[in-house]
From Swiss-Prot:
Described purpose of this protein according to its UniProt entry: May act as a scaffolding protein within caveolar membranes, functionally participating in formation of caveolae or caveolae-like vesicles. May be involved in epidermal cell adhesion and epidermal structure and function.
Modification note: ZDHHC5-catalyzed palmitoylation predominantly occurs at Cys-4. ZDHHC5-catalyzed palmitoylation may be required for the formation of higher-order complexes and for neurite outgrowth in cultured neural stem cells.
Family (UniProt): Belongs to the band 7/mec-2 family. Flotillin subfamily.
Tissue: In skin, expressed in epidermis and epidermal appendages but not in dermis. Expressed in all layers of the epidermis except the basal layer. In hair follicles, expressed in the suprabasal layer but not the basal layer. Also expressed in melanoma and carcinoma cell lines, fibroblasts and foreskin melanocytes.
Gene designation per UniProt: FLOT2
Location(s) in or outside the cell: Cell membrane; Membrane, Caveola; Endosome; Membrane
Broad class of the protein's primary localization: membrane
Pfam families to which the protein is assigned, alphabetical: Band_7
Taxonomy of the source species: Eukaryota, Metazoa, Chordata, Craniata, Vertebrata
Biological process according to GO: anterograde dendritic transport; cell adhesion; epidermis development; negative regulation of amyloid precursor protein catabolic process; negative regulation of gene expression; positive regulation of canonical NF-kappaB signal transduction; positive regulation of establishment of T cell polarity; protein localization to plasma membrane
Membrane topology, as annotated: Peripheral membrane protein; Lipid-anchor
Organism of provenance: Homo sapiens (Human)
Name of the protein described by the UniProt record: Flotillin-2
Gene3D superfamilies found in the cross-reference section: Band 7 domain (3.30.479.30)
Complex and partners: Heterooligomeric complex of flotillin-1 and flotillin-2 and caveolin-1 and caveolin-2. Interacts with ECPAS.
Length: 428
């Protein structure tokens, strides 16, 4: 098993080792690589720009003047596979500071050697050429280390014996002298030239004034001619414009009339269409619904009529059936009552006095209830008699009057019934 290692574009990943003593090396930057456990080794080296500041102090030039020179260099490890392999071979495992020290010492050595071949003026006055020369000389050496010089510039040049300042003062004095001479000659030439220019200016001015006057006179004459011609053309154009305007107005009016006629025809057609639409709308919204409503009402009336007829027929049939049923009931009741009366009569004839006695006994409770009805309102009855035999005689008197009362109420003569006769002791 192993691990997947990733690396950004500012670093290079070096994977070495492998199975069976393999010496294959893989260089990756801005990507990923696979490394086996225990048998593969992974290391990283920076590809970022390194800023160096080489400094050479008191280095004698070709003229023997001691100068101190400082510069700024931008270097980085190259990413070409062969050069990256060279750089990894020499710097892998070292930190950035160690790499910078190696390159810095190389640049300072070349800078010292080049200073010894140039004069102070060449170094001071043409710094770009001096820096270019350093780059060209140092580039092959650092290139063999896998390092690329991106830029190299001279930062400062100075000395401790004021050679540069003296050189500057001398040059400044020469320049100042030449400047004063140049100013005097320029002022002299300027005065002469100014006078000549004034003379030429006056000559030119006089000639110009003459030409201006001639041109002005010719201009006024030409202007008058042009004005007259313009007025004529203007009048003709105005007349032609008015005539053309009148013709155009006539055409416009004619077209307006034609447009009005067409619009009126279209309006008439639209009104006719509107009348047809309104008629159809009235038919659809008023007439058809009214006809439908009338038809619906007619159907409802006919249905109601049929309903009432059927209801009347049903009611008549109902009344007839009820009448027939009631008549049948009355007839059955009459027949039953007649049969009952017939059976009673036969029973009375068959059983004689016993039947009559049963009839009397059946009627007696009703009679007693009618007789006793007034007594229900009496709280108590007090019999006043000084003799016990008097009470007995009163009871016998009431019993003796009972047959007459029954005969009056029912038409039955109890005195003719032997059992009652014996009980009451009535003599016929």
């Amino acid at each position: 098993m192993g691990n997947c290692h990733t690396v950004g574009p500012n670093e290079a990943l070096v994977v070495s080792g492998g199975c069976c003593g393999s010496d294959y090396k893989q260089y990756v930057f801005g990507g990923w690589a696979w490394a086996w456990w225990c048998i593969s080794d992974t290391q990283r080296i920076s590809l970022e720009i390194m800023t160096l500041q080489p400094r050479c102090e008191d280095v004698e030039t070709a003229e023997g003047v001691a100068l101190t020179v400082t510069g700024v260099a931008q270097v980085k490890i190259m990413t070409e596979k062969e050069l990256l392999a060279v750089a990894c071979e020499q710097f892998l495992g070292k930190n950035v500071q160690d790499i910078k020290n190696v390159v810095l010492q190389t640049l300072e050595g070349h800078l010292r050697s080049i200073l010894g071949t140039l004069t102070v003026e060449q170094i001071y006055q043409d710094r770009d050429q001096f820096a270019k020369l350093v780059r060209e000389v140092a580039a092959p050496d650092v290139g063999r280390m896998g390092i690329e010089i991106l830029s190299f510039t001279i930062k400062d040049v100075y000395d401790k014996v004021d050679y540069l300042s003296s050189l500057g003062k001398t040059q400044t004095a020469v320049v100042q002298r030449d400047a004063d001479i140049g100013v005097a000659e320029a002022e002299r030439d300027a005065g002469i030239r100014e006078a000549e220019c004034k003379k030429e200016m006056l000559d030119v001015k006089f000639m110009a004034d003459t030409k201006i006057a001639d041109s002005k006179r010719a201009f006024e004459l030409q202007k008058s001619a042009f004005s007259e011609e313009v007025n004529i053309k203007t009048a003709e154009a105005q007349l032609a414009y008015e005539l053309q305007g009148a013709r155009e107005q006539q055409k416009i009016r004619q077209e307006e009339i034609e447009i009005e006629v067409v619009q009126r025809k279209k309006q008439i057609a639209v009104e006719a269409q509107e009348i047809l639409r309104t008629d159809k709308e009235l038919i659809a919204t008023v007439r058809r619904p009214a006809e439908a409503e009338a038809h619906r009402i007619q159907q409802i009336a006919e249905g109601e009529k049929v309903k009432q007829v059927l209801l009347a027929q049903a009611e008549a049939e109902k009344i007839r059936k009820i009448g027939e049923a009631e008549a049948a009931v009355i007839e059955a009741m009459g027949k039953a009552e007649a049969e009952r009366m017939k059976l009673k009569a036969e029973a009375y004839q068959k059983y004689g006095d016993a039947a009559k006695m049963a009839l009397v006994l059946e009627a007696l409770p009703q009679i007693a209830a009618k007789i006793a009805a007034p007594l229900t309102k009496v709280d108590e009855i007090v019999v006043l008699s000084g003799d016990n035999s008097k009470v007995t005689s009163e009871v016998n008197r009431l019993l003796a009057e009972l047959p007459a009362s029954v005969h009056a109420l029912t038409g039955v003569d109890l005195s003719k019934i032997p059992l009652i006769k014996k009980a009451t002791g009535v003599q016929v």
